[in-house]
């Protein structure tokens, strides 16, 4: 749906809403541009009021300082899943009034939270260059198979994601990954599997590096954020994604505790969570809708690049927020020592 038509449709949802200034905070970049086109402009055209977009880098401390000082100037903030859980526990966010947002049954289960609404799904996946690798890898076992697929592998320098991928490569079913990794033997098994691949690993730390490695021919496969591969494809690069065993996570909309524009903030969250708005967003960046009804409004080409499409999500693993909150510090310390050897 074009923004102008989306705006017209929203007039029903925002019938007599006073003009107000709403401050919406996100991470900027291509995601921020997609939100501006799909959400901000449509909201303003529908009479919802003026939106001021602010970029940040996920600094929870800024939200905490506002809330504790009772001087809240941010109305809606995009947060990552660990910050959602921590901020909710600390009382930094308003409770979400789902009766004003939408039908919970329409959303992915992970998108429904007492303090937030999942706004998009992103995934860490396996990627390769279709011009350089004619036989497509189909699972993490292929990523580890340097005889069948000779060459370097790009991997994010950290324990997170890599330990999960290692266990899947070693035959652990997706549904059992965190159950196995939570044990001493399971962690040992994951590090042992990583050690097998270590001579062939080229580490990356910035999200822009994996597609650069592929295009330059430095690696034959790499882990990558799906949105980065999508951006390279839009630039004409023939990069491909293997979705099997990808690890997905969500970003969420929250309202800082004490926002003076709570009603307007709820209306914005409801609009940006609607099927039409989320479908428009997904056309501009390949992050998946959390409202399942949005998928019916997208063509096959767009669906094929989304983590939330049925074909791409059927063998995916949801990022274990609780697991990494409990064991992340120890595993990252162990990984750093292992990587330095």
PLM features: what roles do these ranges have?
Residues 279-341:
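C-terminal capping/gating helix-and-loop segments adjacent to ligand/active sites or protein-protein/ligand interfaces
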Residues 29-36, 73-74, 79-211, 215:
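Extracytoplasmic ligand-binding site segments that recognize negatively charged/polar headgroups
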């Amino acid at each position: 749906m074009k923004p102008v038509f989306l705006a017209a449709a929203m007039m029903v949802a925002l019938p007599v809403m006073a003009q107000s200034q709403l401050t919406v905070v996100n991470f900027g970049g291509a995601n921020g541009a997609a939100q501006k086109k799909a959400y901000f402009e449509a909201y303003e055209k529908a009479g919802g009021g003026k939106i001021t977009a602010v970029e940040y880098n996920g600094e929870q401390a800024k939200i905490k300082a506002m809330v504790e000082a009772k001087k809240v100037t941010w109305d809606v903030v995009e947060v990552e899943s660990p910050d959602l859980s921590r901020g909710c526990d600390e009382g930094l966010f308003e409770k979400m009034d789902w009766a004003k947002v939408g039908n919970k049954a329409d959303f992915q289960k992970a998108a429904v939270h007492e303090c937030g609404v999942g706004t998009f799904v992103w995934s860490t996946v396996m990627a390769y260059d279709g011009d350089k690798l004619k036989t497509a890898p189909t699972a993490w076992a292929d990523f580890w198979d340097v005889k069948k697929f000779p060459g370097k592998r790009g991997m994010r320098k950290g324990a997170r994601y890599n330990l999960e991928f290692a266990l899947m490569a070693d035959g652990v079913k997706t549904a059992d990954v965190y159950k196995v990794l939570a044990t001493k033997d399971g962690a040992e098994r994951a590090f042992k599997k990583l050690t097998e691949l270590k001579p062939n690993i080229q580490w990356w730390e910035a999200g822009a590096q994996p597609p650069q490695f592929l295009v330059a021919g430095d690696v034959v496969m790499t882990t990558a954020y799906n949105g980065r591969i999508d951006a390279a494809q839009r630039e004409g690069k023939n990069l491909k994604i293997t979705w099997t065993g990808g690890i997905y996570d969500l970003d969420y909309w929250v309202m800082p505790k004490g926002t003076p524009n709570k009603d307007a903030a709820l209306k914005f969250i409801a609009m940006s969570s609607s099927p039409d708005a989320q479908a428009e967003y997904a056309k501009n960046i390949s992050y998946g809708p959390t409202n399942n009804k949005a998928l019916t409004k997208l063509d096959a080409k767009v669906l094929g690049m989304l983590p939330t499409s049925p074909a791409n999500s059927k063998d995916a693993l949801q990022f274990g927020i609780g697991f990494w909150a409990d064991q992340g510090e120890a595993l990252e310390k162990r990984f750093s020592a292992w990587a330095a050897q």
